[in-house]
Regions:
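Pepsin/retropepsin-fold aspartyl endopeptidases
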Residues: 1-177
């Protein structure tokens, strides 16, 4: 289904029978998506340069295989790459490829992702192989700057723009039980 609220290309639910020859992937766990009423929680496998056949078009796109999203959707980044004409009287859709590009490669590698939750700056997503921090860990300072209500959004942005958190001096309270 078309989902203009999903900013990615193509998403499909995880199924153990799925098998792709593409090893260009990124495995993430945590709360990657926010819906209108909640946050998701699960594992996401993001593939780049996946060959896709869409009608008569052979393309490459990013594909997300998700344990948290249970629908097969095409998102706005994919939708914008086509001109759509919907004929409601005859129940037909006509599609023409336009000049808008379809993202097929990762623009950056995500190791971790932070979000302000309940007035705390928490790690909500991590790349599966990362072991330095855990989901739910609270970040209390960044580069010796204490996280406060006044700067938490600014520090969240800094963290989420930084590909390698090893380049930052972080003080973290572990959530491990």
């Amino acid at each position: 289904k078309m989902d203009s609220g999903y900013t990615g290309n193509i998403i499909m639910p995880y199924n153990e029978k799925l098998s792709f020859k593409n090893d260009k992937k990124l495995e993430l766990e945590g709360s990657l998506f926010q819906t209108i009423s909640s946050h998701t929680s699960g594992s996401e496998i993001l593939y780049e340069k996946m060959p896709i056949t869409f009608g008569s078009f052979n393309l490459e796109a990013k594909l997300n295989v998700s344990t948290s999203i249970k629908a097969q959707n095409i998102g706005i980044d994919f939708i914008k790459a086509f001109d759509w004409l919907i004929d409601y009287n005859n129940n037909k859709i006509y599609v023409k490829r336009n000049q808008n590009s379809i993202e097929s490669v990762f623009t950056r590698k995500v190791m971790y992702y932070a979000k302000v939750k309940a007035e705390k700056l928490e790690i909500v997503v991590k790349e599966k192989s990362q072991t330095k921090f855990n989901l739910g860990d609270e970040i209390v300072s960044v580069n010796r700057q204490k996280v406060t209500a006044e700067n938490q959004c600014e520090l969240q942005d800094l963290l989420n723009r930084t590909e390698d958190w090893n380049s930052l001096q972080l003080e973290v309270i572990s959530n491990s039980k």
